[in-house]
Amino acid sequence: PHPPVWIPGSGSLETWDWVLDRDYVYCYLSYFGYLRGLRVVQGFWDRVAQRGIDDNPHRLGFLQLVCVSETDASAEAEYAEHVKYFYRKMLRIHPPFAESPGYRSIRSIRESIRPQIGEEAQKAAQELEWKDFVDQGHIIAGSPATVRDQLTEAAKMLRVGHLMCLLHIGSMPKDLTLKNTELFAKEVMPSLKDIWSEYLDPWWPQRLNQAHPAPVGD
């Protein structure tokens, strides 16, 4: 026996089949958000259909950067510098390491699934400002109501059952990270829990029926 297995990926076509062969969860780790990620995710669901496998949304996980504040304006004031730091500084990887020979198959290259790190990704983000990051879906940010609405849209658009929200971004300090996490947990997450509730989720970890916890040590 083992806990459910979740496999991270960035668009390799072979990973889709490897995951489906083993009935694991495929987790697309997207730094550029749900609008750009839709093409890869749709490719995954197309492959699921081609293989005659059920399209339970919980087969898919998706990483989305999220910033929550009291209002849309305060979200920009609090998070903009840290988001810019992330995209302009933290995706810097020497090109030969980001796209080394043999790292991706010819099949994946032909499908034009581009890497999210390295020189190309860095250049693409250099000129973007807060409004661009929001409008292009790189981040979902704003008041709790704004974030709830956009995450609901993203979950349904992608048909994703395991929405993984990245709440510490770039140079974000501890106090702001805690605020982001608390606002998300209290004012956003409860509204998202029933999305896809009509589907069973066998890939979510379950507690052992006959567990015998060890006593807490001194």
Task: Cite the ranges covered by each PLM segment.
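Alpha-helix-loop-beta-strand connector modules within alpha/beta enzyme cores
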Residues: 182-196
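An alpha-helical appendage that flanks or caps ligand/catalytic pockets
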Residues: 35-160, 193-218
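Hydrophobic faces of well-ordered beta-strands that scaffold small-molecule active sites
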Residues: 5-8, 24-29, 58-65, 163-165
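Glycine-rich, proline-tolerant flexible connector loops at the mouths of alpha/beta enzymes
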Residues: 31-34, 165-177
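Short, contiguous acidic/charged loop-to-helix segments that flank catalytic cores in large enzymes
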Residues: 136-142, 171-175, 179
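Conserved, mostly hydrophobic/aromatic
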Residues: 5, 19, 44, 75, ...
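Short, proline-enriched alpha-helix->beta-strand connector loops that line the catalytic pocket
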Residues: 1-4, 134-135
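A conserved active-site cap/scaffold subdomain adjacent to cofactor or substrate pockets
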Residues: 11-41, 45
